Amino acid sequence: MAIKLIAIDMDGTLLLPDHTISPAVKATIAAARERGVNVVLTTGRPYAGVHSYLKELHMEQPGDYCITYNGALVQKAGDGSTVAQTALSYDDYRFLEQLSREVGSHFHALDRNTLYTANRDISYYTVHESYVATIPLVFCEAEKMDPEIQLLKVMMIDEPAILDKAIARIPAEVKEKYTVLKSAPYFLEILDKRVNKGTGVKSLADALGIKPEEIMAIGDQENDIAMIEFAGVGVAMDNAIPAVKEAANFITKSNLEDGVAFAIEKYVLA
């Protein structure tokens, strides 16, 4: 069955290490779109960290979409307006922020427009997230957060060795109550239990009348597994972690070798 939608992770997949898109990848995405295929950037980033790439790829038309915050938000690519949203509550935030202190990790939280931290010793990785995602960073003590806030995800962030120790201390019931997954060695993302990239892709596909077998998903990290398993064609980058490769139907080349282009050529343009 022909592919009608391609869901592409950004960091480690679409993007080179310097956060640029190679000419070959741009060309194959454009060729797929010319054939009427929906190409959807599917990322843990907020819209602000995606918009410049959507513009670069000319993916801001009325029928273009993006999936942000690891599936918590499905948006129209042109203006960022909401198609579907699933958020964490203030009570979730207070519980998880306290948990981060108990397990020994830095912590931050994101709504649609702002990155919040209650850590006075703000982590380098929080600053890094603010820079890469081009989203403002605000210090706010946990008890002073707006009780009506709609947080799309929270994150434990730290040096990989410290974060791994913190993860090992997280009670099993927390991992059952929320979606808990790694997006990088220094990022642990925690979302509403109903949220992952797979549910985000499904929500959009249902709205567009596209079947799972008509979808290709490409990724490299733990947070990509759900959409790779959901898609009819799940593709792992050669630079992907082992669990992603195990979940995939096909292993393409690395992001340094235009792996996204190779997969699109094989399954869409051939």
Describe the function of each predicted region.
Residues 23-124:
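Active-site phosphate-binding/coordination module
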Residues 32, 43, 70, 154, ...:
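Residue-level signal for inorganic ion chemistry
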Residues 99-218, 239:
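Conserved acidic, metal-coordinating active-site core of Asp-based
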Residues 36-40, 64, 153, 213-214, ...:
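Short active-site oxyanion
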Residues 4-17:
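Asp-based phosphoryl-transfer active-site loop
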Residues 62, 70, 174-176, 230-231, ...:
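Short, structured coil segments at secondary-structure junctions
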Residues 1-5, 22, 189-270:
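Mg2+-dependent phosphoryl-transfer enzymes with acidic/Ser/Thr/Gly-rich catalytic loops
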